[in-house]
Amino acid sequence: MSRILDNEIMGDEELVERTLRPQYLREYIGQDKVKDQLQIFIEAAKMRDEALDHVLLFGPPGLGKTTMAFVIANELGVNLKQTSGPVIEKAGDLVAILNELEPGDVLFIDEIHRLPMSVEEVLYSAMEDFYIDIMIGAGEGSRSVHLELPPFTLIGATTRAGMLSNPLRARFGITGHMEYYAHAGLTEIVERTADIFEMEITHEAASELALRSRGTPRIANRLLKRVRDFAQIMGNGVIDDIITDKALTMLDVDHEGLDYVDQKILRTMIEMYSGGPVGLGTLSVNIAEERETVEDMYEPYLIQKGFIMRTRSGRVATAKAYEHLGYEYSEK
């Protein structure tokens, strides 16, 4: 069964997110630093009648990187072609996509860190000088063909910016760090979603739901759908703070946005290793999860909320973790 607090996209959520997607920067809630910079860069590019510099958007899943790419294209008034790193298996796949671009178009590559190196190398000249050289044929009969490209904007999105090669990263003129949402911004998103889908929700309920959504709009919208179900079956259809708390408690989402897996990680650290330090590999084995899963899905939020610290010797549970789970904490 999928974890309800998973920040990766699930089921029909892609369709839901398209329905909720804002069209312009003024409609986009949160990520103000990224928005303010992009507004200037986009207006300047339009005034010069040039393609916008290539843009790299990075940060945890579910924070709106894909939405931002579509908003950028709308602001520029150009077409957007969407693909992803895992889909582009060979250089010829990328060449076919590049060959379809019109002047000023946006090419959006999600999970750009997963591009094969042979494909990435084709991007270098395409991004820098808007041309590619490709080999036609094989063996002695092969020949190089020079293909000019129209000026275009590449928008790359990644959850693993550290996995990008230096040559690729250096070719992005604009970078945007998408951060976890503050409580107020996420509350506004919950209320906007409820309004679009004609759900009746109190401000207190929206605030409580936002508080327990791990700073992530995708999770907030998912929880809102589940809480609506509880409101219809256990209440009068109105989503208030009482039904919200009852629903999220039944879904094992506590007041800090932690679920049973998060709590299992912290309890294991405290009960088996006296709070740590404990290595990530050892911790992963004890909770029966893959190391990469713990590192990518669980740990970032626990660190961001101050429940875990990374040290040279391993992960350490903080006093806040002890207090949250009801353990007595003593300084080591």
Swiss-Prot record:
Domain notes: Has 3 domains, the large (RuvB-L) and small ATPase (RuvB-S) domains and the C-terminal head (RuvB-H) domain. The head domain binds DNA, while the ATPase domains jointly bind ATP, ADP or are empty depending on the state of the subunit in the translocation cycle. During a single DNA translocation step the structure of each domain remains the same, but their relative positions change.
EC number: 3.6.4.-
Function field: The RuvA-RuvB-RuvC complex processes Holliday junction (HJ) DNA during genetic recombination and DNA repair, while the RuvA-RuvB complex plays an important role in the rescue of blocked DNA replication forks via replication fork reversal (RFR). RuvA specifically binds to HJ cruciform DNA, conferring on it an open structure. The RuvB hexamer acts as an ATP-dependent pump, pulling dsDNA into and through the RuvAB complex. RuvB forms 2 homohexamers on either side of HJ DNA bound by 1 or 2 RuvA tetramers; 4 subunits per hexamer contact DNA at a time.
A GO CC term assigned to this protein in UniProt: Holliday junction resolvase complex
Stretches for region Head domain (RuvB-H): 255-332
Residues that bind ATP: L20, R21, G62, K65, T66, T67, E128, D129, F130, R171, Y181, R218
Keyword Kinase: no
Family: Belongs to the RuvB family.
Record region (Small ATPAse domain (RuvB-S)): 182-252
Entries under CDD domains matching the protein: AAA
Protein name per the record: Holliday junction branch migration complex subunit RuvB
GO molecular function: ATP binding; ATP hydrolysis activity; four-way junction DNA binding; four-way junction helicase activity
Cellular compartments annotated: Cytoplasm
Positions with a binding annotation for DNA: R291, R310, R312, R315
Sequence segments annotated as region (Large ATPase domain (RuvB-L)): 1-181
SMART domains in UniProt: AAA
